[in-house]
A protein has these predicted regions:
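Active-site cores that bind ATP or allylic diphosphates and position pyrophosphate for catalysis
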Residues: 1-378
């Protein structure tokens, strides 16, 4: 979830002891409103809780009830804690529903909530997200994008990650929706597709991205089809309910629909309901595959994957000020971490090795265990 993701990232940065600012993108681009909303959601004042309970009793989903409760709560001027009641906060907080309906705003609020809960000294700042919406599935080509009356500037046709993935799975068709064919393979991009991608991805990143595509090193969620089928075959309602994000209702739904579940993406479509969103189902199925039952409240270590030579001083500062163990070699981890830390690291290594194994099965390359991978130094 956005809440767990944000808490994990923020607790890691806070534990390093050298981070003084957290910058993230959001649709609103205004930190004051995001901080104000975060404060209410963390403190949960009595008036807000009563409003939330009332809207939930009317049958609204939790996100909808939360939006309505916050909208009503901020109709009272006394409930503003910020200093800009007549400035930035007022117009933005009058659009609570719009703010809470956009994914990057939601994640930004969760970052602010995590900072508050940790009593962190890190200061949050935000920049306005440019380009198409987070869930947009089309990638307009350069010429058509620049002439479109719906696009106001050159940055309006920056594609979303969802759209880029859709384009890769439908090569040569930058305007098609994501394929519904569960067996649709990821093919190497043709010239037209590659040109569209190159206009949407920074040059250095595009080089790495295209190299991976050309060599077949690109996985989709349906790469997990067989593994998911195996995992679900050996579960029952009680055991499924023990996995993170799997409620008893979802567990029963999985068992009842098991004969209809084919691929990963098709299973998500079959299982989702009004209350159980697509992203919730995706997370739940991944947790079943990866055998994840609980989320840590904080990340108890930091693992260095790589660094630039000119930034080596920063690494020295982290080693000096970090409040959590810093791991550069997996072989040293067992002696540096407690039981919880070793469990989390074990889950991380397993996930990485599974991904590596799937790539090897697809491309035929030699398997490289996570512990054998070298630190990247640029």
């Amino acid at each position: 979830s956005a809440e767990a993701f944000a808490m994990g990232g923020v607790s890691l940065l806070d534990g390093l002891g050298v981070v003084d600012m957290l910058c993230f993108g959001s649709e609103s681009g205004e930190i004051s409103a995001l901080k104000e909303l975060a404060e209410i959601l963390v403190e949960e004042p009595e008036e807000y809780k009563k409003l939330l309970k009332s809207f939930l009793s009317e049958g609204l989903t939790f996100p909808a009830a939360r939006s309505q409760a916050l909208t009503e709560y901020f109709k009272n001027p006394r409930n503003f804690s910020g200093d800009d009641f007549d400035g930035v906060l007022t117009p933005l907080l009058n659009e609570v529903t719009q703010i809470l309906n956009t994914p990057n705003n939601i994640l930004g609020i969760e970052y602010c909530k995590a900072l508050l809960r940790l009593n962190s000294q890190i200061r949050p700042v935000t920049i306005r997200r440019e380009g198409m919406g987070y869930h947009e599935t089309t990638v307009p080509e350069g010429d058509s994008a620049s002439s479109s009356p719906d696009l106001q500037s050159s940055t309006d046709f920056f594609a979303s990650a969802t759209a880029i993935r859709s384009l890769i799975q439908n090569p040569g068709d930058g305007h098609s929706e994501a394929s519904s064919d569960i067996n649709n393979p990821v093919r190497n991009p043709d010239t037209k597709t590659a040109n569209i991608l190159s206009s949407q991805i920074p040059p250095d990143a595009f080089y790495v991205f295209k190299k991976a595509l050309d060599s077949g090193e690109f996985l989709t969620e349906n790469s997990l089809d067989s593994i998911l089928s195996y995992c679900l075959m050996k579960e029952n309602v009680e055991s499924l309910s023990s996995y993170m994000d799997v409620s008893e209702d979802l567990a029963r739904r999985i068992i009842n629909q098991q004969n209809l579940l084919l691929s990963f993406s098709q299973s998500v479509s079959v299982l989702k309901t009004r209350e159980l969103t697509q992203t919730r189902i995706q997370r739940a199925l991944l947790h079943i595959i990866l055998n994840i039952h609980t989320a840590p409240t904080q990340i108890p270590f930091a693992r260095v994957l790589g660094f630039r030579r000119e930034s080596s001083e920063l690494l020295s500062q982290i080693k000096q000020h970090s409040q959590i163990p810093l791991i550069t070699k997996l072989a040293d981890a067992q002696n540096l971490l407690d039981s919880e830390g070793n469990q989390i690291l074990s889950e991380t290594v397993f996930s990485s090795n599974l991904y590596e194994k799937l790539l090897c099965l697809k491309t035929g390359r030699k398997f490289c265990h996570e512990s054998q991978k070298q630190l990247i130094i640029l």
